[in-house]
Amino acid sequence: PGLVVDCYNDILVTQISNTGMEQHKQMIYDILLEVFKENGHIIQAIYERNDIKVREKEGLTSYKGFYYNPNNISPQTIINENGIQLQVDIENGQKTGYFLDQKSNRVLLRNIARNKRVLDCFSHTGGFALNAAYGNAKAVTAVDVSNVALQQGYQNAKLNHLEDKIQFVQADVFDYLEQLKDNEFDI
């Protein structure tokens, strides 16, 4: 690997974890901008999330910030994922801002959640909880230790008019699981 590239609307977010990619990032970024342009997608900014510990093993410094941002756009954006609006904080969110690699799993949950009681552990900003609620789950509980993540999840629920369908719980997930009754949740 060594390179992660996620696209949020017109912002590319990159994460470089090895020296080889770091040495060639200008060429990589130029190619990315050109490929997106050729496909009709004009990129307005490139944000680097090179604030991961693995870079230290390669002797690389840890940093994050805009590499390219001629229009001075914000590191926060709203994306649409399969009909659900999500606020993404590219600057402070986990990984590159959101877990795009879980997109198909969130849709799978949406498709099986109808009339089920769903528990979303380590809910982050609520992607799975939102999809369960959108899929007409009977009840949805989102648990995370981070109050900031839960607040973002609640804002995402409001953005989609689902705030009354999801209960947000700030707790250590392992402690929370210990206190559950048998069969309290279906999923």
Walk through the language-model features, giving the residues of each.
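Glycine-rich nucleotide phosphate-binding loop and flanking beta-alpha elements
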Residues: 20, 54, 125
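Anionic group-transfer/hydrolysis microenvironments
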Residues: 8, 17, 50-51, 91, ...
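Short glycine-rich loop/turn motifs that provide flexible caps or phosphate-binding loops at active sites
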Residues: 1, 9, 58, 125-126, ...
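Rossmann-like S-adenosyl-L-methionine
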Residues: 71-187
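Non-catalytic substrate-recognition/targeting regions of SAM-dependent transferases
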Residues: 4-6, 26-98
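Conserved catalytic micro-motifs used in adenylation/nucleotidyl-transfer and phosphoryl/amide-
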Residues: 1-25
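Short, charged, low-complexity patches
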Residues: 21-25, 29, 102, 106
